[in-house]
Amino acid sequence: MTLDPVHYDGIATLAERIRHDTDPDEQRDVAENVWENALDPLYGDDGAVLEPVDGQARRTGPIDELALQPQIFESVHGVDSGTINPTTFKNGLLVDLAQAAMSATPSSLDVHRNRTYIMTVYSNDVSVDHGMEDWTEFDDGYGRARVVHTSDLARDQERVVHGLALYLAESHHALNNADIVDDLLVLDGPLYPKQTVHWLDRHGTLADLVSEDDLVEAVVANYLHLVERFVDRGVPLVGFVKSPQSQALIRTLRDRGLPTPWATDAAFFARVLERREREGDTDARVRDELTWTNWFRSRLGADGVFGGADQEVGVDRGLAQSAYEVVFFVIYDPRTDLLFKVELPAAFAEREEVRRAIERWAVGEVAAQRGPPLPVAKADELARIDRGQKRELTRRLERGFDTDVDTNYDRERWGI
């Protein structure tokens, strides 16, 4: 039986029973107060965790003009990875397969053809080797594949198998193709593998986790070495976060006794950057101008872990600790009511001309694409494994393992 109108009405009354102590106007006022009085800098228990770079400011520009500005970089490459999602087989194996790809703008068929595949395998069978196998090449050397066996890292093994596959594929692909990038490389997502911090429920620090597991060590080392590689070459490396989910800023504000009527950091910044004008009896959103913040140096949450001292991450690094710190700004697009985050290693952000170039490129791309920059969108499309491909790959794995998927009713009904 589907929902009838009477059901919709009944459900809607539930929302009316929930108290709303803060209306949208009050939320904007609270956000404005936090912006004006709490972020220059914002202090945590061990010092400043968020600091403006060259002053705190909000910037705006007409969307049409930003979209038509000249290109800042002659070429831009993007990199992303996608998976078939964790799948359990009747032989006891939990498997995920990730594909990483790099985009080039302007397009390059050779770059787009290149692929890196990582298959992560977990088993409760203690006799299964928890290590990394050698790389296998195919497609005349354009494809590389590797099987890795994960160990018991966290309570949610599916999350670990999935995360390791994505991170290993993306980071290996980026490192293996780093030398073809001449002007700018953009990761589809944060600069660092921040989900690994969420696996610390059984471990005191990331360094403890790294010391216990070679795969986590490889992931963390790859992303830190990627920064080093691009700093050494003098080519900027950027992380473009399409859907920021962090709550580290909100938690810190709450710990300082400040009101936080927002679910995420992105919701706070969206209220700070949204501009409204009076139209008759209502306030309407200004939709023809992008708004964005200044750059901030961040030690919030996972940012502080990866930008911290060597003993905190468990990996030796070739640059000063401060070079790895995350420096970011956020862009608000009023056409879609979406917020995007742009991350840059401090080693690059120290130079004003680099910050300005990245800022101009990012806002221009968001204005022109009405969403993520074209190199990011292309990398996402290249790396994505669609539903039909997932089904075929799963069938191939069943034949290879000589077993069936350990299915359930949800998978049968919903195809998940």
Q: Where would I find each of the regions flagged by the language model?
A:
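Compact, glycine/acidic-enriched structural inserts
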Residues: 11, 18-20, 105-157
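Adenosine ribonucleotide-centric catalytic and binding domains
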Residues: 74, 78-125
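Short linear interaction motifs
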Residues: 53-79, 155-159, 163-169
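Polybasic, low-complexity association/targeting segments
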Residues: 1, 21-29
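Long, contiguous domain-sized segments
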Residues: 2-11, 15-17, 36-48, 56-58, ...
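Beta-sheet entry/capping signal
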Residues: 74-76, 182-185, 236
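N-terminal nucleotide/polyanion-binding subdomain common to many enzyme families
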Residues: 28-36
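Long, hydrophobic/aromatic-enriched structural stretches that serve as scaffold segments
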Residues: 77-85, 91, 135-164, 186-195
